């Protein structure tokens, strides 16, 4: 029987007033659950000295080579990030932004925010039409859609503070790939045909790079990017100033000025990547570190884990109706809170302490009825004291000393705006769509935002990107993350729960079918692979089940007690690779 809803409000009111709850101390981290079966269904890649997991085989090899040359995990991560800007242009980028989570061999965990920023001339209603309704063409495919890019600044900050190799060395592999070219693989060919065709043919600079004889490049064609190679050479020689104050800045600002965009040289010169304190929590004795705002991921992963801690997930079992019901109901509440409270922390007060408090989670858990789903129409954000495509991309790196890096970055939708800035070879993002063009109206991924995420100058839009590091007994245990827009949070959540509660190795946790609920729309989205009987049970309990396409593309590394590395790339993607030595 559900406890009265007002208990939740009492708990929240106390938190907002500065009150405290006595919460039982977390037990030491238990070993992952064992089912007494020795044989694994899926086998991870194994290495001892270093490992890289990314969506592209060429980029993964670049990272492994940097590790072999004596670079640490940060050096390798930056090299992979620049390489993906060449080999995976649908999401890898210089003209976008993202987040990095890193944990040093000494146990320091930190977050680097290089999310795009709204230009100084941005205004709250800039994406509304004459009738006051959101105009997706403005926020997705026009020059107005681009925020000031952060990738180059973020990589530079990470390398300067935590790397060991010079920028010139880690950028060289990307320069070579851009200058000499590489063979187009299945993933790029398919995305150019499916998504690129919607935006790239509208812009001659872009078409000249990715089209041949009037058609998108096909598998087996060679992609050479001479202009991008020159831009990378400028960055290698002159550092981030080449991008934010030098000739690349000139190209971007000129492209904007000629086509009605807002980014100016002043916007570029003022951009700074920011190092932030990670969001942290505990789950059954494991420590969980993830991104703080402007990512909503860290807060809500911890929030949902806190709710699940009140249930015996291991006893329920993976793929059971009970486990899926509890997780779906927890996800609904978290996404409702997201819509109300999450935004850019430099502009709005984000009540992260209340949202991640275990007493608040207990009040939510007490409301969940395992036998009856609560309609989303009856769920409101807690009275506390809120969007990327599948072509966001994530990569993970761990080195021989135990340094670990998780990076998720993006252009937003596939190939961003499709606009290449002048002769820079750099595709520009359409990240401005991640703001709430009109609070209460869903964005391109169906996510609803409030006033906290409204458009405003110098603001960074809310994101679901959730690079995450899990620590066991003081040592890095799992490094993970995923693309997937609104489904990033639940994809990463299931990697953690599959590993801890259901005793899966990293490959099994990656391969397991996934599900997702984001409050609105009121739909439990599931991949193929769950028992039809289970889905019928969920429908009988009030869930509106819909079998949909694959979700996410995790790139994960697990560290064994002896330091051995076990990695897995997601089979939902093609041409990705986990490798080590």
Stretches with model-predicted labels:
Residues 275, 389-392, 414, 463-465:
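Short, small/polar residue-rich loop motifs at catalytic or cofactor-binding pockets
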Residues 311-411, 423-424, 439-440, 448:
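Internal maturation/activation junctions in enzymes
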Residues 66-67, 153-161, 238-245, 250, ...:
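Alpha-helical support elements that line or immediately flank enzyme active sites
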Residues 26-61, 73-74, 78-238, 243-245, ...:
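Noncatalytic scaffold domains of N-terminal-nucleophile
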Residues 1-11:
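Bacterial N-terminal signal peptides that target proteins for export
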Residues 86-111, 262-264, 404-472, 502, ...:
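Active-site rim segments in enzyme catalytic domains, especially the processed small/beta chain
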Residues 438, 459, 492, 501-549:
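Extended C-terminal subregions enriched in glycine
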Residues 10-20:
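Bacterial N-terminal signal peptides
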